[in-house]
């Protein structure tokens, strides 16, 4: 009998999620670069989702004309995941990178709680151990810098809310089991764009008003590159995966983003990186490997 995590490409999917999330650990860098270039008020994030939607819209129209789904039945997944992704993206603009990461990376805890309460799934001590190990890694990596993780800045609250929304969206995706990547991706981008717009009033008072047309045009090549080569492919890989590997495994694997984020922030900003960050990052990686290997597909011999 096959276990729940019985997808034939379970380990490969986990590896792609781990790498994609790690790439998101560098996302703060282009976000800050856009802000420095004058794309204030979160308009750099808005532009990325406008470009992504412009790419996907012709495909959606073609699918409609050919009687195929464009994802309307998965609107709840799109609302949760798209809003969560944008809250995270904008959290990097209005707080320190390390603070945004710590509040976002309560995700494994949210994911396991959601699986337990809403999906009625029971876990053994292995899951308790991996979640505890991952959270311990988070605490060691950033606890010495931020102390008790209590939200103070707007970006702290954005990061906290982003983690919960993405965990909830992952659970919803696991329940709905979207047929194919495009329908879910299209809904995520649509609701992500909506989220960028309603967040603008909160961001304009902190990081400035709408940029000028000249600044927007000069930033367009950079925005096209981020949207087409980063936002679309990584969003597709990350948010499709919970339906194949489970919400809890997803929540732990995306901790690779924290590892990359902490190290890159230490190298490229004045934020510190010492033995706590090294030990914490190691614990997070170990937790991810343990979770994947303990849930990889295997066949039980007939009794």
Report each predicted region and the residues it spans.
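Hydrophobic transmembrane alpha-helices of multi-pass small-molecule transport proteins
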Residues: 56, 126-145, 276-295
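C-terminal transmembrane-helix exit sites in multi-pass transporters
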Residues: 60-63, 90, 107-132, 259-278
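Transmembrane alpha-helical segments that form core, pore/gating elements
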Residues: 17, 21, 25-33, 56, ...
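Loop-to-transmembrane-helix transition segments
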Residues: 12-20, 63-87, 131, 154-161, ...
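Specific transmembrane alpha-helical segments of multi-pass solute transporters/efflux pumps
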Residues: 23-26, 60-99, 104, 140, ...
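Structural signature of hydrophobic alpha-helical transmembrane segments
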Residues: 39-52, 90-107, 152-165, 216-228, ...
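Helix-helix packing/entry segments at the starts of transmembrane helices
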Residues: 15, 47, 101-106, 173-192, ...
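Transmembrane alpha-helices of multi-pass small-molecule transport proteins
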Residues: 12-13, 36-83, 110-111, 164-172, ...
């Amino acid at each position: 009998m096959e276990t729940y995590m019985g997808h034939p490409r379970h380990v490969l999917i986990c590896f792609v999620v781990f790498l994609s999330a790690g790439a998101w650990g560098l996302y703060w860098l282009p976000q800050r670069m856009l802000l420095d270039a004058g794309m204030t008020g979160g308009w750099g994030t808005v532009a990325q989702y406008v470009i992504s939607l412009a790419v996907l819209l012709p495909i959606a129209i073609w699918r409609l004309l050919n009687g195929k789904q464009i994802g309307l039945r998965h609107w709840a997944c799109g609302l949760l995941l798209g809003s969560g992704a944008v809250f995270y993206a904008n959290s990097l603009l209005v707080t320190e990178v390390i603070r945004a990461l710590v509040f976002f990376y309560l995700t494994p805890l949210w994911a396991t709680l959601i699986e337990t309460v809403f999906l009625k799934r029971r876990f053994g001590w292995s899951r308790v151990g991996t979640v505890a190990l991952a959270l311990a890694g988070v605490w060691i990596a950033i606890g010495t810098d931020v102390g008790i993780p209590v939200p103070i800045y707007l970006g702290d609250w954005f990061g906290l809310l982003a983690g919960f929304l993405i965990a909830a969206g992952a659970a919803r995706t696991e329940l709905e089991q979207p047929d194919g990547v495009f329908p879910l991706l299209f809904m995520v981008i649509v609701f992500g764009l909506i989220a960028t717009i309603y967040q603008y009033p909160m961001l304009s008072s902190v990081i400035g008003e709408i940029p000028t047309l000249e600044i927007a045009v000069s930033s367009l090549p950079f925005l096209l590159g981020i949207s087409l080569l980063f936002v679309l492919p990584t969003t597709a890989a990350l948010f499709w995966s919970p339906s194949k590997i489970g919400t809890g495994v997803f929540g732990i694997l995306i901790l690779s983003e924290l590892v990359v984020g902490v190290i890159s922030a230490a190298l490229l900003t004045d934020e510190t990186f010492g033995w706590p960050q090294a030990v914490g990052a190691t614990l997070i990686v170990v937790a991810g490997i343990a979770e994947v290997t303990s849930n990889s597909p295997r066949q039980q011999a007939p009794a």
